[in-house]
């Protein structure tokens, strides 16, 4: 879609128009997940989508070539107020997931989210109201340890992340929050039955030093797991 066509629809060409749409990559370790059935999201913080068809495209290209875009643009030209209203629940519903501050279109609403980004860019407020909202906080400490260990472990050992929900607050009618406990499972494929689950402290103070020290690796307390 040309600059002139975008200006005709939205009065301006936003700075993000030629930025690539990002894909949502699931985090190996979670700290918490909060969910809200009716929230407002800043469309300026929407960077991508879980839809596998669009990452790598620019927002301009999605506006031009999206599967349902012509229909949604036609509806927008008839009723732009749809993107400005303060309805408690937007219909059809739209769903967004935020990972560490970056937003992604989740289950539904990719084409409308694209239109909202362009339209609300020049409006007094960039917020889209009445949408489903999920916010994910990840465990950066365990994630960093996981990727370090993958480089250091012998080829016959494998590392598997595990995030287990330990508490959930879902007493409220329209929102809930879950908290997670994280461990890293190491399995030795040469020795059946030799595996172990580690929390961050033992990884930092025990397993990593053993992997970095040839003597500890061969004769230390983790010798059956690592050899």
Regions found by a protein language model. Name each.
Residues 1-103:
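Short alpha-helix boundary/capping and kink motifs at helix termini
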Residues 2-26, 35, 121-227:
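Surface-exposed, charge/polar-rich loops and edge strands
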């Amino acid at each position: 879609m040309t600059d002139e066509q975008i200006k005709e629809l939205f009065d301006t060409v936003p700075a993000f128009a030629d930025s690539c749409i990002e894909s949502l990559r699931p985090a190996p370790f979670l700290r918490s997940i909060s969910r809200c059935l009716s929230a407002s999201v800043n469309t300026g913080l929407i960077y991508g989508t879980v839809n596998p068809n669009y990452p790598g495209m620019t927002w301009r290209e999605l506006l031009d070539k999206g599967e349902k875009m012509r229909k949604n643009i036609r509806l927008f030209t008839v009723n732009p107020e749809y993107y400005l209203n303060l309805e408690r629940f937007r219909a059809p519903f739209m769903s967004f997931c935020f990972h560490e501050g970056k937003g992604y279109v989740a289950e539904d609403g990719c084409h409308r989210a694209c239109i909202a980004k362009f339209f609300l860019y020049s409006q007094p407020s960039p917020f889209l109201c009445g949408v489903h909202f999920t916010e994910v906080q990840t465990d950066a400490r365990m994630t960093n340890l996981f990727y370090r260990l993958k480089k250091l472990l012998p080829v016959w050992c494998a590392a598997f992340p595990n995030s287990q929900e330990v508490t959930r607050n879902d007493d409220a009618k329209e929102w809930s929050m879950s908290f997670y406990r994280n461990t890293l499972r190491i399995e030795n494929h040469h020795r059946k039955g030799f595996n172990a689950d580690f929390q961050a402290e033992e990884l930092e103070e025990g397993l990593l030093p053993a992997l970095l020290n040839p003597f500890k690796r061969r004769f230390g307390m983790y010798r059956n797991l690592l050899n």
